[in-house]
Amino acid sequence: MSDQKKLRLGVNIDHVATVRNARGGAYPDPLRAARIAEEAGADGITAHLREDRRHISDADIEGLMDVLSVPLNFEMAATDEMQQIALRHKPHAVCIVPEKREERTTEGGLEVAREENVLAHFIAPLREAGCRVSIFIAAEQRQIEAAHRIGAEVIELHTGAYCDAHAEGDFAQRDAELARLRDMATFAHGLGLEVHAGHGLTYDTVQPIAAFPEVIELNIGHFLIGESIFRGLEPAIAEMRRLMDAARA
């Protein structure tokens, strides 16, 4: 497979930290998981430093910056505190996500269209510092257009509605969500944006998304950490890598 065709896999290690924090202490170590993910074929590592520090910690981000040989995709809310942390560490990529303290996981995409001026000023220093700025959004044309206007280089399309419809057996809705994702990936690519996708992807749902030629990167975490309980982290990631590559071939 040529480098041009290869789809990148970003492995999100947040929920290794979730398990660690359930008991306190240092085990299991997210940094060890990140190194295993690299060995298993991950092209990058994603970590979300939430405002409430419910899983990934500041020390984890510092450690990842020190040990990784692949790029770090630093997920964060659009707050002054997170901006300062990102500017201090200067990770390869920063993905701006919506965040609510009461949610279990990121429930939807960022409302870029409603906050264009604020977000444009927020991401400017990050871009000047050399970080690639990505915006996590719903597959909606108005959000994509707004992300483009504020100067984002990358968008990440929220695949949760597609994955949820598949899990619920609503295949008509699943197919409609898949078509919407495909159309919006094509639209974003036409604007010159780099297109990523993620949220809720599993072995059963990854290949239709991986087959979109406009999508350059998938970010997958919760499923892989869960599957690692049964088959081990390296084999779980290697199987996802295999499915992605097969869909792209």
Curated annotation (Swiss-Prot):
UniProt keyword list: Cytoplasm, Pyridoxine biosynthesis, Transferase
Top-level division of the source organism's lineage: Bacteria
Pathway in which this enzyme or protein is active: Cofactor biosynthesis; pyridoxine 5'-phosphate biosynthesis; pyridoxine 5'-phosphate from D-erythrose 4-phosphate: step 5/5
Binding-site residues for 3-amino-2-oxopropyl phosphate, renumbered to this chain: N12, R23, G200, G221, H222
Catalytic reaction(s) noted: 3-amino-2-oxopropyl phosphate + 1-deoxy-D-xylulose 5-phosphate = pyridoxine 5'-phosphate + phosphate + 2 H2O + H(+)
CDD domains hit by this protein: PNPsynthase
Similarity section: Belongs to the PNP synthase family.
Protein name: Pyridoxine 5'-phosphate synthase
Species classification: Bacteria, Pseudomonadati, Pseudomonadota, Alphaproteobacteria, Rhodobacterales
